[in-house]
Amino acid sequence: MHSLIDGILEASRARGPATAVAWPAEERRDLVASAAEAKRNGLIPIIAEIKPKALGRTLAQEEVAAYARAYAQYGACAISVLTEPTHFKGSIENVRTARRAGLPVLRKDFIFSEVQLCEVQADLVLLIAALDIDLDRFVAAARALGMEPLVEVHSEEEMKRALSTEARIIGINNRNLKTLEVDLETFERLAPQAREAGVFLVAESGVHSQKDARRMVRAGADALLVGTELMAGPERLGELNRL
């Protein structure tokens, strides 16, 4: 793991979990259904990310709400919200605010404790295989709380682990968490294995143009997760998601 990621994990463990909350499972919004609707409307399904680090600062809740509304307006199928505060300058409150836009919301953080799953209501939660957590247990725990797990992988070994669980959504991160380098060929290399298993597949990181977006779709992506490219201007979403 890159030293930057190690530092984030160390800070997260030192910070400890927030107060646990509870919510009815029937309130969960469905990413797969939302992506299917986007396709019917002639759009590439994009999970648009609220990533304060891209602007180098935390965001006021009014700004978070404005991004979420803009993403909904420009056709996002879901919103990803970074909640890690130390490096990515996110917050749990950003999830609550983003959900008011009406789209499925993915909580994106470095989840290493089941207690963290109870911190905020989200529709989906990121589980990173590289953190060496018990994926079976965390997938079951997330579902029990009404959240759909999105299991993130970067290698063949991690893909095998993810496919051995009950996970229905797998994200392939084109960013190497050891070097932080981005390579779209990562998705192209790992996608066939997941396609054979019939899971819903998300391409993460490295999409900066419509050419990149179409390349990931051709390689088998059911949805794309795009962050940095959209923070400078949410209207870019309307250019990236055209089939």
Sequence positions of predicted segments:
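N-terminal active-site wall of soluble small-molecule enzyme domains
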Residues: 45, 56-150, 158, 187-193
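Catalytic cores of alpha/beta
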Residues: 105, 112-123, 154-166, 197-226
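C-terminal helical cap(s) of enzyme catalytic domains, especially alpha/beta-barrels
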Residues: 184, 189-194, 217, 230-243
